[in-house]
Regions:
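N-terminal subdomain of nucleotide-sugar transferases
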Residues: 1-43, 85-87
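A short helix->loop->beta-strand "cap" motif at the edges of active sites that frequently abuts
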Residues: 13, 109-113
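Short active-site oxyanion
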Residues: 14-15, 88-92, 158-163
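Acceptor-binding helix/loop patch of EC 2.4 sugar-transfer enzymes
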Residues: 55-66, 114-151
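Short N-terminal targeting/anchoring amphipathic segment
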Residues: 80-101, 113-115
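A short, active-site helix/loop in glycosyltransferases that binds the activated sugar's phosphate group
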Residues: 101-102, 150-176
Length: 176
């Protein structure tokens, strides 16, 4: 995210960053220069993404994609709406699959094109995790999550205007 933002800024573009901060990936001012934070008008909203066993298993009944849905936050959604009401954007880049629950909000409040920057195909990672475990129940559950993620990932490509895949392999898989 930082290198892309810096490149866009150096090319004379106006950049606004609104970011999710989690327990695993907390936002810390010290990791960014004051200049970068000022130029990007950086905002960070904490979202609780810790695995909740009850929510994880209830997603089996509701068929929600738990891996993705735990990144949705009404606080972040409200902050996003506020930004979209105040400013117009040409492009809104979603920095991972886990930001896609906000596509509906973006579409309702902006005419901007939405680009998904895909770091990897998440379902492949979960498939590998499933294959690596010897616990049969866990393997079944992880395979279920991998299947759900695959359906979600390939469904979401129809909801965005473009995909910026990090690797050629992922770009080819998305194109298939």
């Amino acid at each position: 995210m930082n290198n892309i933002a810096k490149g866009l800024l150096s090319a004379g573009n106006d950049v606004k960053i609104i970011s999710i901060s989690t327990y695993k990936h907390p936002f810390e001012n010290k990791n960014y220069s004051t200049s970068f934070l000022d130029k990007t008008r950086f905002e960070s909203i904490y979202v609780e993404t810790k695995v909740n066993i009850i929510d994880a298993f209830s997603s089996l009944v509701t068929s929600d994609n738990y891996n993705v849905s735990r990144f949705f936050s009404t606080d972040f959604d409200r902050a996003l709406v506020e930004v979209l009401r105040k400013e117009e954007f040409d492009i809104i880049q979603l920095e991972s699959l886990f930001m896609t629950p906000y596509i509906g909000t973006i579409r309702r409040h902006s005419k901007a094109k939405i680009v998904l920057r895909s770091h990897n195909l998440e379902y492949i990672i979960w498939k590998r995790l499933a294959n690596a475990t010897s616990n049969r129940a866990k393997r079944v559950y992880l395979n279920y999550l991998a299947k759900q993620l695959k359906e979600y990932e390939f469904g979401v490509i129809n909801e965005v205007d473009g995909i910026a895949a990090i690797s050629k392999g992922d770009a080819q898989r998305y194109a298939e």
